[in-house]
UniProtKB/Swiss-Prot annotation:
Disulfide feature: none
Principal place of residence: cytoplasm
Name of the protein described by the UniProt record: Protein GrpE
Biased composition (Polar residues): 1-17
Subunit structure: Homodimer.
Organism listed in the record: Ehrlichia canis (strain Jake)
Length: 199
């Protein structure tokens, strides 16, 4: 009989020996599996911690991006407000000076109406008047001469009414004194005579 036959017979004769060996084999196989499971669980735990940290960082990033957008918007608002203040200040500074010049324009215009065209000084007064109007226009000061327009209390001052059946009521018939605006701000309203229907 060979040794292997003897081992087989001895194993068959002694079943507890076979059970002990297979139990040891199972235990020795379970040790690496437990280690693997423990390592895997630690890795999962670490991954969950990292994912949680990533979520926190994403929330912080979104918060900082929102803060940045708000800061940029605030900066743009401040810039726009400052530019408007600068524009308003320059308009205000020019307004007082321009208002003083308007009486000179009115005087030159009155002189032109009273002078005859063949009068020797008419050409000089006309040239001075046109140059003054051009200077005002270069500084965004525009003349309001609203004949035929509908009366607008924002830009016109009614000094009188005149009956006119051909025109709609409150139509400007005559301009007594022209008005002026600087950019979109009223410098002086136009003094006007407006139409009315007969009673």
């Amino acid at each position: 009989m060979s040794d292997s036959d003897n081992n087989t017979k001895s194993q068959q004769n002694n079943p507890t020996q076979t059970d002990e060996k297979s139990g040891e084999e199972i235990q020795s196989n379970q040790k690496p599996q437990r280690k693997f499971t423990a390592v895997l669980n630690k890795k999962k735990e670490k991954l969950n911690e990292d994912l949680s940290e990533l979520d926190k960082l994403k929330q912080q990033l979104a918060h900082f991006q929102n803060q940045f957008r708000l800061a940029v918007a605030d900066k743009e608002n401040v810039k726009r407000i400052m530019q408007k203040n600068i524009d308003d200040t320059s308009i205000y500074a020019i307004s007082n000076f321009a208002r003083d010049l308007l009486s000179s324009c009115d005087n030159l215009e009155t002189s032109l109406k009273n002078l005859k065209e063949d009068d020797s000084i008419h050409a000089g007064v006309l040239m001075t008047y046109k140059e003054l109007l051009n200077t005002l226009e270069r500084h965004n000061i525009t003349r309001i001469d609203p004949i035929g327009e509908k009366f607008n209390p924002q830009f016109h001052k009614a000094v009188s009414q005149m009956t006119d059946e051909d025109k709609d009521e409150n139509t400007i018939l005559h301009v007594v004194q022209p008005g002026y605006i600087i950019k979109d701000k009223l410098l002086r309203p136009a003094s006007v005579i407006i139409s009315k229907k007969s009673d």
